[in-house]
Amino acid sequence: MKKVYFIPLLCFVFLFQSCFEVIEEVQMKDDGSGHFNFVINFSQSKTKINSILKMQKINGYTIPSKDEIKKEASKIEALAQSTSGISNVKTNIDLTNYIFTIDLDFQKISNLNTAFLKLKNSRKLDPSLSTDYFTFADKKFIRTQKIPIKTLYEKLEKSDKEVFQTAKYTSVYKFDSTIKSFSNKNSTTSKSRKAIKLNGSIISLINGNEKIENTITLN
């Protein structure tokens, strides 16, 4: 019997079998420190989710209680807080609208990658999966995607694959300095050129039709 809780990228996705949006935001200061915010929003499907939470299991997955969900979020918060260079960790579990949020500050971007690594190890995920998603050096911010998401996707059951068909993602990166250039041409910058945004479809990302990778050079 399968049981899924808060994992690095998709929280309760297979349990809720619902439309969702992932929002990733990084605020980078010139000194390399910054703030990270990650949201998974199921609010469009809250009626369906309320019904699912009354069940014991769905598609082989055990349905956790609301107290169990909160407990797992607390574990994630404690794990991140114990990571060197990470501070002010806050998780918010909105079980009315089903919006799950984690906020934290980092001294340098590598601290954030370390927190992802600790989270991966705590879930006993494939040790070969890279968690080095971000780098920042010499006025260059790089978002990479090294996880073989297509391969992982193909291993899923058909019913699990379906949840990604309408899923969306948004990435927002903000800086003290203005943006000189960026590699992902689907991105758009703010009028001040101190922020850049990328919207897309998760299934298109899985199939390779869209990319989340971006190399952003600052002035």
Predicted regions span which residues?
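Mature, soluble, non-transmembrane domains
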Residues: 77-219
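Positively charged n-region of N-terminal signal peptides that target proteins for export
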Residues: 1-5
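Domain-level marker for long, solvent-exposed, non-transmembrane regions
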Residues: 6, 20, 46-51, 141, ...
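Start-of-domain marker
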Residues: 20-84
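C-terminal motif of bacterial Sec signal peptides marking the signal peptidase cleavage site
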Residues: 15-18
